[in-house]
Amino acid sequence: MSLNPALKFRDFIQVLKNEGDLIEIDTEVDPNLEVGAITRKAYENKLAAPLFNNLKQDPENIDPKNLFRILGCPGGLRGFGNDHARIALHLGLDSQTPMKEIIDFLVANRNPKKYIPPVLVPNDQSPHKKHHLTKEQIDLTKLPVPLLHHGDGGKFIQTYGMWVLQTPDKSWTNWSIARGMVHDSKSITGLVINPQHVKQVSDAWVAAGKGDKIPFALCFGVPPAAILVSSMPIPDGATEAEYIGGLCNQAVPVVKCETNDLEVPADCEMVFEGYLDRDTLVREGPFGEMHGYCFPKDHHTQPLYRVNHISYRDQAIMPISNPGLCTDETHTLIGGLVSAETKYLISQHPVLSKIVEDVFTPYEAQALWLAVKINTHELVKLKTNAKELSNLVGDFLFRSKECYKVCSILHEIILVGDDIDIFDFKQLIWAYTTRHTPVQDQLYFDDVKPFALAPFASQGPLIKTRQGGKCVTTCIFPKQFTDPDFEFVTCNFNGYPEEVKNKISQNWDKYYK
């Protein structure tokens, strides 16, 4: 039987194993910092995804055999072949699919006509219905929840799971990712902030006077396509389950929760159920985030998720994301998916759609940059200049209603010509440093809000003003705006004539024996 890595988490793991991209660690590993340190080393060196089969257990863990193992780096980069293999597998694509094609696949499949609703299946088709813990049996503090970073304010149980919430009128069921930290034996606290959909859905309950008891489910080890789409900036009100069905051309099987009316993926490792209490606020964080820092004194006041039921499968596996220095899931998923949605939105723009070929958030910039590749021959036809182009791009991506939420994480948009491969950071940074005049070729947008998690925003004056810090940088030579035949020779291998390059490539083994 063929494997389905997009819709079955264990199949995803098996494909990684089959392709030599999984390492099973049977040596005992302490979830207190050791798991985090190992995963960080794996991310930063593009090593195989680690599956921790033998976590150091609290003697009071009610079911140490099945609660639980940990999979690290599920969306990290691969160190051989196609580096984006794990992201491709999340979508059921061939593991050799490069990031540009992944982005194009997401753009091509954004059509709402292709949405396929989930299908409700019996509980016996759901492995996580095997074991159950009641409210009285639950003690989250006894589970092997990892302390991922040295500066974290607590143990973050939720870094790669999926929250499920539904509006009171049941018109919108939202699947999303937002971090969650163990607060006490039976509750989790996590970020419930704008522009996240979990905030918008829970706001509807608050407006109805029921903000203290909002039903939720927290699912771990969900279909990889589900966790990817849960990271996507899809339109408000859109249902992720239908979106996933459209992407995979197959309905997502779902089952009913045990203590509320929510439906969750049938293919889960663990499901926590309970209710979100927006009226009770507690200390949350800090947590090492996507930009590579943890500030120990930076904590927040956030609401509680009260857990009253846990269901789980045999030898359950909890996938985790350990954010930090590139490249991890906060870059490959969040940054990559912002690239896809931005490319789609640009394709709908009457002017930019004619000149923009590709967009990408380079990981080396921690998803704070967006590189935009411009067709310079089409650019000439616009009869514009650098300042006007920068204003057009920035006004649309930073200010417009369509793009504001999608591009909220971005602080600098970099425009380059079509000779640059924006997926190659070496080329991008070369163009950035040599083709723009600092300040002169940068247009600032001081009226837009900064991304609060960006370290220069959270640790500087922007945290008070909450305005500015964003710009568009034009790395296109002035003559390229007016002369379609403007020529320059790049002093690298690709700059040589084709016949010379072909001859060199054919005879390379003779030169370097």
Swiss-Prot record:
Disulfide bonds: none
Binding positions for Mn(2+) per the UniProt entry: 174, 197, 240
The protein's enzyme class: lyase
EC number(s) on file: 4.1.1.102
Domain of life: Eukaryota
Molecular function per GO: carboxy-lyase activity; metal ion binding
Cofactor: binding details: Binds 1 prenylated FMN per subunit.
Protein name in UniProt: Ferulic acid decarboxylase 1
GO biological process: cinnamic acid catabolic process; ferulate metabolic process
Chemical reaction(s) catalysed: (E)-4-coumarate + H(+) = 4-vinylphenol + CO2; (E)-cinnamate + H(+) = styrene + CO2; (E)-ferulate + H(+) = 2-methoxy-4-vinylphenol + CO2
